[in-house]
Amino acid sequence: MASQVSRRAFLQVAASGAIAGQLDSHFHPATALTQAKSAASDWSLNATIIEACSCTMFCPCYFSMVPSGHGHGSMVDHYCRFNMGYRVNHGNFKGVKLDGVTFWIAGDLGADFSKGAEWAEITFEPSVTKEQRGALTTIIPHVYPVTWKAFTVGQDAPIEWTATNDRAVARLNGGKAAEVVLRRNPGMTSEPVVIKNLRYFGAPRNTGFILMPNEVEAYRVGPKPFEYKGTNGFMITYDISSKDIKT
């Protein structure tokens, strides 16, 4: 895209019918933002994410707008290339139930996301209804108030999502499209290592970051595929509702 598009504007357009393929850059963000605000009535979302990125453990993007550097000397590049395997525990939007919905978000925050993030792509499981997509694409922008240079919608694909105390696995299209495998970070006991009282982007409540470095995190489709091993990973459950949003 030639111009930056806010995630909120993108997702509102996606909800109105752009889900079939990549975004066209000629829609009107201001109109979409107005629609998003008018649509944000009573809703709630409680979701768990299997998340990993290219940053070192623990990802600095929760403390700073500049991701980890990669390389040496003058050749250092900063980026945060991430995968998020989402499972909705419970949620609703204007009577639309969201319980059990799974979807995927992958992308790159770039060198300094205070100046705009690079790209992201959202992919839904085929069973997600039009109404559920509309609900989620209205709610999710409140969680990630980021401006993207490009944001596209991926082709629907099945999502595998499993988690135990020691291991978490999320795969998009059987791993052909994307994959995240996490293992529990060793602590002083057999219990997970958890960071408490740290905000997860725009979500006002969470149960803590369960530290689980990745065995692999990969995005294998599109023009910018990537794969990393042994970098940052965690699980988190957050909660947000329309009552948390200032109008």
PLM region spans:
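C-terminal segment of N-terminal export signals and the immediately downstream linker at the start
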Residues: 24-46
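Beta-strand-enriched cores of mature, soluble protein domains
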Residues: 41-247
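N-terminal secretory signal peptides and thylakoid transit peptides that target proteins
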Residues: 2-18
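Short N-terminal micro-motifs specific to bacterial/archaeal maturation
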Residues: 1-2, 46
